[in-house]
């Protein structure tokens, strides 16, 4: 399951990603309809889903601040809102990497993705690793 942050809702990303991603694509608000979902609640909501991969452009609040958790994956894209159309292609590249091409390979990982690389850390390992894409 791919879960998009509230900043990405209504931009058509659900549809574009849904064309090639075989699982469900949703937005975080569907986990708590009718309420504002604050960043500190997102990990709690993600733990309720089955192996979700959370996508956000709000990287300052998650990258190196969020703890990796074996029940989900966080992927941060340091992009301004006007460049969010780049997310589906970048996400697809990340999901093709052998380290992250399965849910099991992604769980427990926090990533920051740019056009050229994926920086990531994992549960119980605070070291940041880098892969080229």
Ranges and model annotations:
Residues 1-6, 10-21, 40, 62-133:
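Acidic, PIN/NYN-like endoribonuclease modules and their adjacent C-terminal/linker elements
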Residues 21-22, 50:
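Proline-centered flexible-loop/turn and helix-kink motifs
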Residues 23-33:
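A short beta-strand-loop structural module common to alpha/beta enzyme folds
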Residues 28-30, 57, 77, 113:
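Conserved beta-strand termini and adjacent loop/short-helix elements that scaffold enzyme active sites
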Residues 31-33, 60, 80:
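Short, solvent-exposed coil/turn elements at secondary-structure transition points
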Residues 46-67:
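Acidic, metal-binding active-site segment of PIN/NYN-like and related structure-specific nucleases
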């Amino acid at each position: 399951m791919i879960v998009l942050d509230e900043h990405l809702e209504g931009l058509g990303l659900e549809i574009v990603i849904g064309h090639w991603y075989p699982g469900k694509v949703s937005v975080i608000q569907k986990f708590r309809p009718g309420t504002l979902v604050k960043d500190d609640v997102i990990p709690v909501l993600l733990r309720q889903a089955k192996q979700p991969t959370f996508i956000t452009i709000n990287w300052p609040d998650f990258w190196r601040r969020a703890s990796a958790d074996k029940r989900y994956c966080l992927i941060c894209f340091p992009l301004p809102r006007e460049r969010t159309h780049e997310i589906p292609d970048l996400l697809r590249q990340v999901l093709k990497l052998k380290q992250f091409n399965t849910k099991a390979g992604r769980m427990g990982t926090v990533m920051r993705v740019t056009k050229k690389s994926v920086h990531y850390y994992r549960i119980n390992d605070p070291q940041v690793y880098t892969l080229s894409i």
